[in-house]
């Protein structure tokens, strides 16, 4: 299906984002624990050399070999992002210097400010806030990150360093009550591990993110739209052709009504017929 969409709407599938599997086991979340490991150059170098479609790869920077991994993929033009991590401030600062300039699903699968016995410590979240130029993304469905925290991210990181993502599974946008993974259930408008130990992805579509940011987090519509278009395009290095309505760019246009429901979609200048509800 993805290949078919790519044939119809040229340049719409921009590349691959690999979220695993160089992650912290303690922050596995919906990842498969058996696959989690530390970065291994004997594994990732052949992958990068073989697959030029990889545009982004995540890792927990506190793992052995993570700094070497970050430097390597950054040199290859791949965005390095921190994810599923328990990194402390020095880990994050060193990681940023090694090329990790972005944070995957910020606030999820990473600790915030916490206490160990009688002492208090910054978490990964605060460490990322302290690096002004580090960009973040948030699952803005209102469940993965509550609206009050979405507004906090907006106030601290700002429009130009925050982008909105769905982190959605294949069941997003459907009426399905079952996920493709038997470990996962769909409940309360979100995917969860069946044992209720963690969230496991969303069922949100991008229009829902806009509605959440505007109607619940009380963020200006123009800024919410920029965080869903302009900012991610800049982070991924495709702003020359995506992310804004300008002459010469790809004509990707969404028309919404006053309640922010989708009324029509143009992809690469072509109207997607099944989306058109404009009379």
Where are these regions (language model features)?
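Metal-cofactor-binding active-site regions of metalloenzymes
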Residues: 10-31
């Amino acid at each position: 299906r993805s290949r078919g969409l790519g044939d119809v709407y040229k340049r719409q599938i921009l590349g691959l984002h690999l979220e695993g599997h160089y992650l912290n086991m303690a922050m596995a979340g919906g990842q498969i624990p058996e696959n989690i490991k530390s970065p291994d150059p004997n594994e990732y170098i052949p992958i990068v050399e073989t697959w030029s479609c990889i545009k982004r790869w995540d890792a927990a920077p506190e793992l052995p070999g993570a700094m070497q991994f970050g430097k390597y993929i950054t040199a290859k033009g791949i965005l390095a992002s921190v994810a599923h991590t328990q990194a402390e401030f020095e880990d994050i600062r060193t990681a940023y210097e090694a090329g990790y300039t972005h944070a995957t699903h910020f606030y999820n699968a990473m600790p915030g400010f916490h206490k160990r016995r009688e002492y208090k410590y910054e978490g990964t979240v605060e460490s990322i806030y302290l690096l002004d130029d580090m960009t973040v993304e948030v699952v803005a469905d209102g469940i993965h990150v509550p609206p009050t925290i979405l507004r906090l991210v907006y106030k601290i990181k700002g429009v130009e360093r925050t982008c909105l993502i769905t982190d959605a599974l294949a069941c997003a946008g459907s009426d399905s009550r079952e996920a493709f993974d038997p470990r996962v259930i769909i409940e309360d408008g979100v995917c969860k591990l069946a044992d209720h130990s963690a969230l496991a992805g969303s069922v949100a579509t991008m229009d829902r993110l806009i509605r959440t940011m505007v109607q619940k987090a009380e963020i200006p519509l123009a800024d919410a739209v920029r965080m869903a278009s302009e900012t991610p395009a800049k982070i991924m290095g495709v702003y020359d052709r995506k992310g804004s309505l300008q002459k010469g760019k790809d004509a990707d246009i969404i028309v919404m009504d006053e309640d922010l429901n989708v009324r029509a979609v143009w992809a690469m200048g072509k109207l997607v017929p099944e989306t058109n509800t404009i009379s």
